A protein has these predicted regions:
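N-terminal secretory signal peptides that target proteins for export/translocation
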Residues: 1-16
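Beta-sheet-rich non-transmembrane sensory/scaffold domains
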Residues: 35-660
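Bacterial N-terminal signal peptides
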Residues: 14-33
């Protein structure tokens, strides 16, 4: 058991206040390649500079070949350590070993349309993301504080039905975080991470037509913690569950493959030797570019499971690369961008690699790149078969809280997907378009339609007193940049139909700015909610329900003014605010509030911190429901104003009472 690594997320609880209110140290800046030119010249330059390469990456042919590869890496590492020791005159002092540090848009492409109504604010239509509330027939399914709940909503009802633990009956849930949940047909999947058992935990539950839940099975996957302050570890396309897990390897180990991802079905008395490797050598790919183990080594695994079978039969594909990573899923492919963890020398984070894993089971391909994306919203695989990525010169991925502390120059990488190969070639300098660098450190970005929007705000820290900041709007097809002034920081960017909305604080008040995305992008309107702050920071905390080409209603959790962003881990939102959008002009229609005085002790045993938040605006079949902790508050619109219709409590005690 990985007892040494239990405190990683737990330690953060005591350190969070200090970390997110401290002044962020300015990181060294590395210039990204940025050139502009006509497409003909760029294309010619790209072709002329390409080296001969295979179309896809090569997997190891045998276990022996893979082990020989690791032995070679280890030997090269030892020689490099000796060389540095002699050069520095400090022979015998070991080099820093980062490899064993286990501490822990609106889619432009025609995404597959989901016939079922979605209640999750996803990056791509048809690509669901692991969250805390989902819809199953006439029932809401909620994951909260280590338990699963169902609430009946059919025929106008709002009634708690069922509650079960989000883990097996014989599992000790201590030191385990149950973070994400997805629903496929009559299967509920819970994704968690266990420091006690050392890996990703996948729980399968049955849900029937009446909304009753029952436990089916649990599987453990050997991995490091997947947690990201912004990203989600799992996706669902149709019945296909896709989840990403990193595993940091020790290149000094005699056989690093002993640490490879493995799975076991949980039962009482389960032993470590029951783990069965799910990634054979013939499914481990590496690029032709040499890996520098001095900056860390990781196995990035994408596991795909067909939930239509009712079991946990999965295929896994893995790539070897640097440890820094960002995981992105488009309707067509899975992308993993890896960045070296190098903290010395003049070329920090200059070498990166992006891997493409098609969902049609074709072999992975790769491309050498520079810098690092901020998070999954830095990506767009567009319908013209290009990968568009915003990169910063000083970033290391979005694991844990890495996305909250990026810095450096900014560029837009736009490269044809056809340029990916076996990793021999790098993206051309013509593929990068230099962009203005905003002031500030908490960076937000989002692709909406044919535009990329970005800026900086307060994020997880204390609200900054910003009476004005820059919002940059980039046409990703031609690179034209518009610089807009907003009267607040940029803490959230969301699609508003074919336009956008930017949310941020001035230190005391919460601002909502609508952005018209046309030939000349512009700020169309601003609404100010005085004395408020965002109650949720994750993308799922927001939802916009259109009811016309240029109209609809949006919902966002709000809290008290001046609250630091990280407090959403501990505090429930005070209310969910609803605004009406009419041609990019906002009007408040009201809010649905929490009644915190009614809160009761839920006897929480597991996952007692809301890492993924606890409040959501829900628009379901013409109804509006605010999820505020254990409360579900339904509202109705009368004369353009929100009025509370009813509220229910779905806590464990309330479910018992409701069931009689």
């Amino acid at each position: 058991m990985n007892r040494d690594f239990r405190p990683v997320r737990i330690f953060v609880l005591s350190a969070t206040s200090f970390v997110f209110t401290a002044v962020v140290t300015l990181l060294a800046v590395i210039a990204l390649a940025a050139c502009a030119g006509n497409s003909t010249t760029a294309s010619a330059s790209r072709v002329a500079g390409k080296k001969p390469a295979n179309k896809n990456m090569r997997a190891f042919a045998t276990e022996d070949e893979m082990k020989a590869y690791f032995r070679k890496l280890a030997e090269e590492r030892r020689r490099e350590v000796e060389r540095r020791s002699v050069t520095a005159g400090i022979a015998g002092e070991p080099a820093q070993d980062l490899a064993v540090n286990k501490a822990e848009a609106q889619p432009t492409s025609p995404a597959a349309k989901d016939d079922k109504e979605s209640i999750t604010n996803t990056q791509h239509a048809g690509v669901d993301e692991g969250g805390i509330v989902k819809l199953h027939g006439d029932h809401l399914v909620v994951l909260r504080r280590g338990r699963l709940f169902t609430v009946a909503i059919g025929d106008g009802a709002l009634k708690p039905l069922s509650v079960v633990n989000a883990y097996g009956p014989e599992i000790d849930p201590r030191y385990t975080w149950y973070d994400e949940m997805l629903v496929s047909e009559d299967t509920v999947v819970v994704i968690g991470y266990s420091y006690e058992r050392g890996g990703t935990e996948v729980g399968l539950f049955n849900i029937d037509r009446s909304g009753n839940l029952s436990y089916r099975s649990t599987y453990h996957l050997r991995s490091n913690d997947y947690y990201s302050s912004r990203n989600y570890a799992s996706r669902l396309i149709g019945n296909k569950l896709i989840f990403y897990t990193p595993l940091y390897l020790n290149p000094y180990a005699a056989d690093p493959s002993l640490e490879f991802p493995a799975v076991r079905k949980w039962h009482k008395g389960a032993k470590p030797e029951e783990f069965q490797r799910i990634v054979s050598a013939t499914h481990v790919y590496r690029s032709e570019r040499a890996i520098n183990p001095d900056s860390g080594l990781a196995l990035h695994t994408v596991t795909t499971c067909d939930l239509a079978n009712g079991d946990f039969k999965c295929d896994a594909t893995a790539v070897l690369g640097p440890p820094g990573r960002v995981f992105y899923v488009s309707p067509e492919s899975v992308y993993v961008w890896t960045t070296e963890w190098s903290y010395y020398g003049p070329h920090r984070n200059e070498k990166s690699m992006v891997y493409r894993m098609p969902l049609d089971r074709d072999s992975p391909s790769a491309l050498g790149v520079s810098g690092s994306p901020v998070d999954q919203f830095s990506f767009l695989e567009s319908e013209d078969k290009h990968l568009n990525v915003l990169v910063r010169s000083n970033g290391s991925g979005d694991d844990m809280w890495s996305a909250e502390r990026t810095a450096g120059d900014v560029a837009l990488l736009r490269v044809p997907v056809s340029e990916f190969d076996d990793g021999t070639n790098d993206a051309s300098s013509w593929d990068y378009h230099g962009l203005p660098k905003p002031r500030g450190y908490t960076f937000q970005n989002r692709f909406v339609g044919e535009y990329l929007l970005y800026g900086t705000g307060s994020g997880w820290g204390a609200p900054e007193n910003k009476s004005e900041s820059n919002l940059f709007v980039v046409n990703w097809r031609d690179g034209e940049v518009s610089q807009l002034k907003v009267n607040h920081g940029v803490d959230r960017i969301e699609a508003l139909g074919s336009d956008a909305i930017v949310v941020g604080t001035d230190g005391s008040n919460l601002h909502f700015s609508s952005i018209r995305l046309a030939d000349e992008p512009a700020v169309a309107d601003e609404f100010v909610r005085k004395g408020a702050s965002q109650g949720e920071l994750r993308s799922h905390g927001f939802f916009y329900k259109p009811d016309g080409a240029n109209s609809g209603v949006l919902g966002l959790p709000i809290s008290v003014p001046g609250r630091s962003g990280y407090r959403h881990l501990f505090d429930e939102s005070a209310a969910i605010l609803f605004l009406r959008n009419d041609g990019l002009h906002f009007q408040e229609v009201g809010e649905l509030t929490a009644q915190s005085e009614r809160a009761v002790d839920d006897a929480c045993r597991a996952s007692c911190v809301d890492w993924y938040g606890n409040s959501r605006p829900l628009f379901i079949r013409g109804r509006i429901i605010a999820m505020l902790g254990y409360e579900l508050v339904e509202g109705t619109m009368k004369n353009g104003q929100m009025q509370e219709l009813r509220r229910v409590n779905y806590s464990p005690q309330a479910v018992k009472i409701a069931r009689g």
